[in-house]
Amino acid sequence: PLQVTHVQYSRGGGNVAPRRPLFLCLHGWGSNEADLADMMRYVAPYNDFASLRAPLVLQEAGSGEFGFGQGAYSWFHDCVPSGEDLDRDAYAAAQAIDDWVARNVPEDRAVVPIGFSQGGLLAIHLLRVHPERYTASISLSGFLAPGIVAGSAPADSHVAELNIPVFYGYGKNDTVIPMPELFATAAWLDEHTFLTSKSYRGVDHAVSLNEFSDLRDWLAAHDIAPGIL
């Protein structure tokens, strides 16, 4: 089974504001744990975070096809898998993340996954595996596993009862995730969660300052992170 072994925490080992929710940062394909850690100072600078490195290695730290840096990693065996392969990859990665949370985060600490692309799918899939553990979820340019492999999304039958707040944002010019898949993800979330969905004109497979602004407002409205003046 997959296992999360590398984590970057916010200051103080992710324990400076223990009464506020801990953000669980999940990067996209070909990135690493530093990616979303940098983003958090714009989104929720007064909350703690734990940014997890995906366990599948595309390139170790140094120079290579992904440039020079801290390395490139993936949660799945392909950039954008589909069908049964995506179900299996999503379940394996979500289980690895959920296991890490169980081992490393006190049970009474609220946890909010925030992910981009592959990580955005997993921020949703954690709700399809163990929804009771997660206070809310944020999917940025994420997509959805189809749920055709039996047991790969075991909580689908009851997650809607929990009415978990979810923020879902994507660019209207996304060329990585097909637009019908983004629409289908939003539709599934609307049916199964307490959804706020936003789309951004002129934005590709990326995040934007407008999205950060909307996300900050949403976090404040749901009392997840204090508003920023």
What are these regions (language model features)?
Residues 27-29, 114-116, 171:
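Conserved alpha/beta-hydrolase "nucleophile elbow" surrounding the catalytic nucleophile
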Residues 146, 172-177, 205-206:
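Acidic catalytic loop of the alpha/beta-hydrolase fold
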Residues 106-115:
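Alpha/beta-hydrolase fold nucleophile elbow
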Residues 2-107:
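Serine-hydrolase catalytic machinery in alpha/beta-hydrolase-like enzymes
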Residues 162, 168-170, 174:
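Short beta-strand/loop motif that positions the catalytic acidic residue
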Residues 132-144:
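A conserved short beta-strand
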Residues 180-229:
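C-terminal catalytic histidine-bearing segment of alpha/beta-hydrolase fold enzymes
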Residues 115-119, 123:
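Gly/Ala-rich beta-loop-alpha elbow adjacent to hydrolase catalytic centers
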